[in-house]
Curated annotation (Swiss-Prot):
Homohexamer. It is found in: Cytoplasm. The gene is coaD. ATP binds at residues 9-10, 17, 88-90, 98, 123-129. Its EC number is 2.7.7.3. Keywords: ATP-binding, Coenzyme A biosynthesis, Cytoplasm, Magnesium, Nucleotide-binding, Nucleotidyltransferase, Transferase. Pfam families: CTP_transf_like (PF01467). One of its GO terms (cellular component) is cytoplasm. Its cofactor is Mg(2+). Belongs to the bacterial CoaD family. It comes from Nitrosomonas eutropha (strain DSM 101675 / C91 / Nm57). This is Phosphopantetheine adenylyltransferase. Disulfide bonds: none annotated. It is an enzyme of class 2 (transferase). Reversibly transfers an adenylyl group from ATP to 4'-phosphopantetheine, yielding dephospho-CoA (dPCoA) and pyrophosphate.
């Protein structure tokens, strides 16, 4: 059974992420959605919140597992005995960074391969960063994220406004 890892911060999980999980789940026996701590970014949602949202959104997939991780992705891949990494490419601008990352990952773990998937056309423009900004400013993000995520974005905005 081919086991693949789809890593990301998923802050929050979007329809674009869901689309890639759906397509990866049809291609591979097991998809591990690996929600990263990502010390280089200041996440809007905590790791626990992001894992919970992803689990709730992806609950209908029998061959998908959602888990959080910290540290190097290649160490996580070794622990999971996974040799394939799935990465999404929305635009040409994503390619250069992802290409470099794939090369560095192969240098750390020569047995790993990176497979690039492009999202369906209707999801190519979705960015979790932009979704957060639209939600923060009170805009409608229902075209971009699952209803459960919309509710969490609303709750988070209230918490932030109350200084929690």
């Amino acid at each position: 059974m081919d086991k693949v890892i789809y890593p990301g911060t998923f802050d929050p999980i979007t329809h674009g992420h869901e689309d890639l999980v759906y397509r990866a789940s049809r291609l591979f026996g097991k998809v591990i959605v690996a929600v990263a701590v990502s010390s280089g970014k200041a996440p809007f949602f905590s790791l626990e919140e992001r894992v919970k949202m992803a689990r709730n959104v992806l609950t209908g997939y029998s061959n998908v597992e959602v888990t959080g991780f910290s540290g190097l992705l290649m160490e996580f891949a070794r622990q999971q005995d996974a040799h394939i990494i799935i990465r999404g490419l929305r635009a040409v601008s994503d390619f250069e960074y992802e290409f470099q990352l794939a090369g560095m990952n192969r240098g750390l773990y020569p047995d790993v391969e990176t497979i690039f998937l492009t999202p369906s056309e209707q999801y190519m423009f979705i960015s979790a960063t932009i979704v957060r900004e639209i939600a923060r400013l009170g805009g409608d993000v229902s075209k971009f994220v699952h209803p459960l995520v919309i509710e969490r974005l609303r709750q988070k905005k209230i918490e932030m406004n109350n200084g929690e």
